[in-house]
């Protein structure tokens, strides 16, 4: 284990992560390699009355830590048991490691759309995978949790017998947003299909995945900029890493989302005065939750909480909660 203090060589690298707009400001960093190291870090914090925060990739950074930072990047072992179809991932492991080791056995985890995200943080937040409506939350598959105090040091979880999936994406020019939103909203969605709708500036993107065949012809309501759909290895549908950048985002869980309200949300995001990218995921299927939709907002800059809340005002009467998975740079 290495220990870093402000001013030490390596301190800045150790406290940095995927989120470049915020960085932790800890008094000390414990770069742990095993559970015994974690125990020492937690003991250091508790005996000095300091808070302790776990840091792996930094994707989900909400509030910068000022006490003890427990960096788990070196504690990243992954073990696959093809006989029991399970995986054990240490606190610093990322999904790409699990995918690469599981795929030769025809197995796959319930990972999300970014393979460089940490396994533990994602799963503890619930875990909305690219196959969520077909198989449920990633957290539903956890068999065993290993902990030191309140710090999770490893998870053991089920893998699924998945080799190939039916998946793809459609991109449209934003001038066709109204028609695309209506087609997406009216989709008589099979329980085994997990779709998302995302606005990306001048583009509206639809994605979808399932282990079983399904049809998306009804979504082609305008000329497509990208039209890619077919059978492919799970790893190709599991998302590609993005470069580190600055961003702020939040989400709400809704128990209904009428079409007219969805259009108001779209218009509010477009007129926010700052870039606001909207993401919508229908829930249901194997996701055991009262919510019917997950609505998330993200911007490539900080200081936009007010603008996001003004967009969320359009759905306030339908809000039943928030997901821990999609909260970035917010308290």
Enumerate the language-model features and the residues they cover:
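Soluble FAD-dependent oxygen oxidases
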Residues: 1-331
């Amino acid at each position: 284990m290495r220990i870093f203090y402000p001013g030490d060589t390596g301190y800045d690298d150790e406290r940095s992560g995927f989120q470049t707009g915020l960085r932790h400001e800890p008094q000390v960093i414990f770069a742990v390699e095993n559970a015994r190291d974690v125990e020492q870090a937690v003991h250091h914090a508790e005996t000095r009355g300091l808070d302790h925060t776990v840091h792996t990739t930094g994707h989900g950074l909400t509030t910068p830590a000022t006490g003890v930072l427990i960096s788990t990047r070196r504690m990243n072992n992954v073990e696959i048991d093809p006989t029991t179809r399970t995986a054990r991932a240490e606190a610093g492991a990322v999904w790409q490691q699990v995918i690469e080791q599981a795929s030769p056995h025809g197995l796959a985890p319930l990972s999300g759309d970014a393979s460089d995200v940490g396994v533990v943080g994602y799963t503890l937040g619930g875990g909305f995978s690219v196959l969520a409506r077909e198989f449920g939350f990633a957290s539903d598959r956890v068999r065993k949790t290993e902990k030191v105090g309140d710090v999770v040091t490893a998870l053991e979880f089920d893998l699924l017998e998945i080799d190939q999936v039916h998946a793809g994406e459609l991109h449209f020019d934003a001038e066709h947003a109204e028609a695309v939103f209506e087609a997406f909203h009216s989709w008589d969605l099979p329980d085994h299909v997990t779709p998302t709708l995302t606005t990306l500036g001048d583009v509206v993107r639809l994605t979808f995945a399932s282990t079983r065949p399904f049809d998306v012809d009804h979504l082609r309501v305008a000329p497509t900029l990208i039209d890619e759909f077919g059978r492919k290895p799970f790893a190709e549908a599991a998302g590609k890493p993005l470069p580190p950048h600055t961003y702020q985002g939040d989400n709400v869980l809704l128990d209904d989302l009428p079409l007219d309200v969805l259009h108001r949300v779209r218009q509010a995001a477009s007129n926010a005065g700052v870039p606001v990218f909207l993401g919508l995921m229908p829930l249901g299927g194997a996701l055991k939750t009262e919510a019917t939709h997950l609505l998330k907002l993200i911007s490539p800059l900080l200081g936009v909480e007010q603008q996001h809340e003004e967009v969320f005002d359009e759905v306030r009467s339908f809000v039943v909660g928030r997901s821990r998975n999609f909260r970035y740079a917010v308290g």
